[in-house]
């Protein structure tokens, strides 16, 4: 019987691809919000490929790193393009992953627990990779960003100082630090690639969620051609936006201080990370205690893990809970405002604003399940 089947269904390797991309049973009603998974895969591919070409010319040495990046931009064929695509590609990666997580929170896809937990691990890995990548050009913001962020580990009782010196490979951010950051920046995307495959493996065990939050087993359609073409439109839009930014204003999202070679003797006026970390940075700064700030920083991402545990509703998805919907969009606004606060100097109106926003950010995760219980009582009169 098998000899009458197409090769994609019988070949050991093609069978895996077929089950993931061609004959995968998909809910017929998934919207544009389900496109971001494939867009993230595209971003990862772009980053790995551009990174591979950059690494051929980059030199991980504090004397040469800044000038090797300069050399790439000035003398390597299309080096400026590869570098700016890589830098802006990271921004698009984070835009896509934040929208992907937002979709997961809104439609409560976190009930696919293993998929969600692996996703949170991928987010941590991505943040670590992006942070280490930011250090590599060895400009002022690279150096001071590395110094400030790694220094946060010194807040850990007993082990802190020893841990920081161990990561630095000395008593300050130096050549050893740059070399190891470069090593891990090269290695982590491949670990992210492996985790993505595990993420998909768990997702395909259960099947995707859908905008109604209902069991869609009775109404599935094959992934190809329906969603391959739908994803292709997303690819075209993403590539268009990425190239528009890269070719018209490539350094818009960067920091002007990073055009100055790293100087340990001169501190920039305002040390800040890239825009995609600013909300977490604002949360870190709003706690007046060092250890407390570090815990708040980690918890701002790690809190996503508690979402499946606080699911106490009778219906899946916020689309049936108007008050929760309203709260969700307030929460989105909080994250945007925290991003803005993170870029502002530490002075009068911004400090208290950041602290209030931090309280409201964490309050969402407490109030959301409580309000959903209240709404269930109204709906079901129990």
UniProtKB/Swiss-Prot annotation:
Cofactor(s) the record lists: heme b
CDD domains to which the protein is assigned, alphabetical: cytochrome_b_C, Cytochrome_b_N
Record's keyword annotation contains Transcription: no
Location(s) in or outside the cell: Mitochondrion inner membrane
Transmembrane segments: 36-56, 80-101, 116-136, 181-201, 229-249, 291-311, 323-343, 350-370
Complexes and interactors: The main subunits of complex b-c1 are: cytochrome b, cytochrome c1 and the Rieske protein.
Protein function: Component of the ubiquinol-cytochrome c reductase complex (complex III or cytochrome b-c1 complex) that is part of the mitochondrial respiratory chain. The b-c1 complex mediates electron transfer from ubiquinol to cytochrome c. Contributes to the generation of a proton gradient across the mitochondrial membrane that is then used for ATP synthesis.
Misc remark: Heme 1 (or BL or b562) is low-potential and absorbs at about 562 nm, and heme 2 (or BH or b566) is high-potential and absorbs at about 566 nm.
Family: Belongs to the cytochrome b family.
Protein name: Cytochrome b
